[in-house]
């Protein structure tokens, strides 16, 4: 991988939040769809800071397992005090409570009511970052939401456990 691509991936995965009062949300996702079956997962690590109240910022952790073969979709969410979270300004390194995502690895668990979803996943091998807007807009205030895919076509392996059912990801 070229030095330029490494620098680009590092910068596009670094956190932008700096405690600003105007409100902020910023999310780091991993998601994958099975190539031939109606199966997928989606995991999100998020900073949410309400407008005018950065002291009320929280980390949010979301996970969804989609099983179209059994028409069973399971979702869970938790909110964690921001003091129990960390988001790197230098690279992909986020922690929401005990859940972490760093370049190439994501691990965590959510229990919400009777639902429990946990994961231990490795990922990599994707293409260069895919910017969905012109590059110059990513450092401006508008638009507020700026999506990008930092590793399109990444491959995953590991496991997800949903309510005691272990699913191998390969």
What kind of feature is each model-predicted range?
Residues 1-170:
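Targeting-peptide/extracellular-domain and disordered-appendage signature
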């Amino acid at each position: 991988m070229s030095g330029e691509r490494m620098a680009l991936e590092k910068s596009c995965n670094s956190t932008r939040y700096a405690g600003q009062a105007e409100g902020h949300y910023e999310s780091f996702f991993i998601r994958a769809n099975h190539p031939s079956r109606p199966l997928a997962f989606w995991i999100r690590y998020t900073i949410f800071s309400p407008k005018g109240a950065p002291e009320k910022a929280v980390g949010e952790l979301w996970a969804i397992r989609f099983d179209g073969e059994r028409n069973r979709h399971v979702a869970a969410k938790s909110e964690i005090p921001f003091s129990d979270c960390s988001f790197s300004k230098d690279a992909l390194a986020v922690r929401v409570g005990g859940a972490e995502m760093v370049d190439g690895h994501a691990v965590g668990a959510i229990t919400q009511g009777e639902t429990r979803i946990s994961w231990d996943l490795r990922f990599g091998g994707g293409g260069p970052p895919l910017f969905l807007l012109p590059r110059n807009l990513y450092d401006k205030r508008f638009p507020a939401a700026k999506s990008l895919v930092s590793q399109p076509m990444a491959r995953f392996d590991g496991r997800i456990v949903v309510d005691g059912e272990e699913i191998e990801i390969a």
